[in-house]
């Protein structure tokens, strides 16, 4: 279980950003933007799934996740930890272990045979569920799992993402209006700060990334992507 040693939030954010660069989980490509599932064009891309392949790094990140939840939500606020199919599942298992809690996972859709279950594992009626994802942009994907948990009788008031895009100022407020507080460890601003500190890219690339973070939809539209996001 977790040792309850709390590292300062800013230090955790910087360390996670450095870890992501170290394992080459983040990429900047301003001259040939990535196309995200939302249809946005983006000069940045992240693959948090790579974390599971680096034991020392994943252990530190999960310690930070536990510290974030205990500090911001409390010690006795949850009965179950839930991960979404598929990226959230290993992180849910590791966080549940640290918090000393049961774990469930949520399918993207009912499996269509047998019990036709969408939630796997034991979730008692009224259980207070903490949902974890590897990353979230505006919370939309997380809410697919939250809605399924609520429909099955669980209570969800908190979610945590190891990495939060933090490019839409209204996103956390939108989640709050739907009854969920979003917690996170690191953001693109932290990653960009480390890239500048270590001079990982030329100024032109770094400035383009910053322009995207300042006005993501305008940057997307200018570079061949959508200029507005579909409603959840």
Curated annotation (Swiss-Prot):
HAMAP family per UniProt: PyrE
Enzyme Commission no: 2.4.2.10
UniProt keyword annotation of Aminoacyl-tRNA synthetase present: no
Pfam families from the UniProt entry: Pribosyltran (PF00156)
Gene name per UniProt: pyrE
Self-association and partners: Homodimer.
Binding positions for orotate per the UniProt entry: 137
Pathway terms, separated by semicolons: Pyrimidine metabolism; UMP biosynthesis via de novo pathway; UMP from orotate: step 1/2
Molecular functions per Gene Ontology: magnesium ion binding; orotate phosphoribosyltransferase activity
Keywords on record: Glycosyltransferase, Magnesium, Pyrimidine biosynthesis, Transferase
Reaction it catalyzes: orotidine 5'-phosphate + diphosphate = orotate + 5-phospho-alpha-D-ribose 1-diphosphate
UniProt name for this protein: Orotate phosphoribosyltransferase
Binding site for 5-phospho-alpha-D-ribose 1-diphosphate: 107-108, 111, 113, 133-141
Source organism per UniProt: Sinorhizobium medicae (strain WSM419) (Ensifer medicae)
Family statement drawn from the similarity comment of this UniProt entry: Belongs to the purine/pyrimidine phosphoribosyltransferase family. PyrE subfamily.
Single GO BP term: 'de novo' UMP biosynthetic process
Cofactor names: Mg(2+)
Function, in words: Catalyzes the transfer of a ribosyl phosphate group from 5-phosphoribose 1-diphosphate to orotate, leading to the formation of orotidine monophosphate (OMP).
């Amino acid at each position: 279980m977790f040792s309850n040693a709390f590292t300062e939030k800013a230090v955790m954010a910087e360390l996670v950003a450095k870890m992501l660069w170290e394992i080459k989980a983040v990429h900047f490509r301003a001259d040939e933007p990535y196309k995200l599932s939302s249809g946005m064009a983006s000069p940045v891309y992240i693959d948090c799934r790579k974390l599971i392949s680096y034991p020392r790094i994943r252990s530190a990140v999960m310690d930070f996740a536990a510290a974030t939840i205990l500090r911001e939500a409390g010690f006795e606020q949850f009965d179950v930890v839930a991960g979404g199919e598929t990226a959230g599942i290993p992180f849910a298992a590791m966080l549940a272990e640290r918090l000393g809690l049961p774990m469930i996972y949520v399918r993207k859709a009912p499996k269509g045979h047998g019990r036709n279950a969408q939630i796997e594992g034991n979730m008692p009626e009224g259980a207070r569920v903490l949902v974890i994802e590897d990353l979230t942009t505006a919370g939309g994907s997380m809410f697919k799992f939250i809605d399924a948990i609520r429909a099955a009788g669980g209570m969800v008031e908190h979610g945590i993402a190891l990495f939060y895009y933090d490019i839409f100022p209204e996103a956390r407020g939108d989640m709050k209006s739907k009854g969920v507080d979003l917690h996170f460890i690191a953001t693109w601003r932290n990653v960009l700060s480390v890239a500048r500190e270590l001079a990982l890219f030329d100024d032109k690339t770094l400035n383009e990334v910053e322009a995207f973070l300042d006005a993501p939809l305008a940057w997307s539209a200018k570079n061949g992507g959508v200029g507005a996001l579909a409603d959840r």
